[in-house]
Amino acid sequence: MHIEPGILSGAKIAAANLAAIALVAAQAPQLLRKPQLVLRTLLAALFFSVFMQSFHLPAGASELHFIGAMPIYLTLGFVPALLGFGLGLLLQGVVFEPADLLHLGVNFLSLAVPLLALHATLGRRLAAGAATRIGAVLKLDAGYYAGVALMVGFWPAMGEVATPFAEWTAFAAAYLPVVLIEPVFTVAAVRLLQSQAHRPLVQLCFAVPARG
C-alpha cells in the first residue's frame, strides 16, 4: 500500500500530510480520556509493524503487505488501530525505510480512511458481537481491503505520472488471498483473548469481552 516517491507533487503530499494530522488530532483526545488506549495504541503500532515487516512484496502499482488490520481493530479497538497505523508507519520509516517518511501522510491515509469508513458503517454493527464468526469477519476484511485498494488507486490518479490501470488491478487482486486468510487468523486471536479475558492484564491491554 506504499506510494512510491515521484508520483505525487509536493503540494499534494503537503495536503495529504495536513489531512493526516487533522485526522490524528481529531482522535488523539480520547487517549487523555481513556489512558488505557495509550497502551493499546502502542501495542497496535507494534503488532502492525511486525505484520508489515513479516511479509511484503511488490504488487502492481504498490506493495502487498500483511497488514493485520482486522485482528488489530477487533482486539484493540478503533482508536488504537487508527493511531497505531500512523505510529507504526512512522517507526518503520525511521528504522527501515527513511525514504517512506516523505509519504507518511499519504500512506497513513491509505490505511486510515478505509478504517474510518468501515468503523462508521459495518464495523459498529458487526464488531461487537460477530468477531468470532468467520463470515462476519470476512465482510469486514473485504470492505476494508477494498477501501485500501481504492485509496491506492486514488493517489496515482491524482499523480504527476500516469500509472497503467493494469498495475492497479494487479495490486487489488493481490489482496484477495489476504482477504480470505486473515479472517481465520482474526477469529483465532479473538477467541484466544476471550478465553483469557478474565485476567487483569488482558483486560488492560485488549478490548475483547469475555465469552458470554
What does each of the following model-derived ranges do?
Residues M52-P58, L89-L118:
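Interfacial aromatic-anchored transmembrane helix boundaries in multi-pass membrane proteins
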Residues M1-A45, A142-F154:
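Membrane topogenic helices and adjacent juxtamembrane segments
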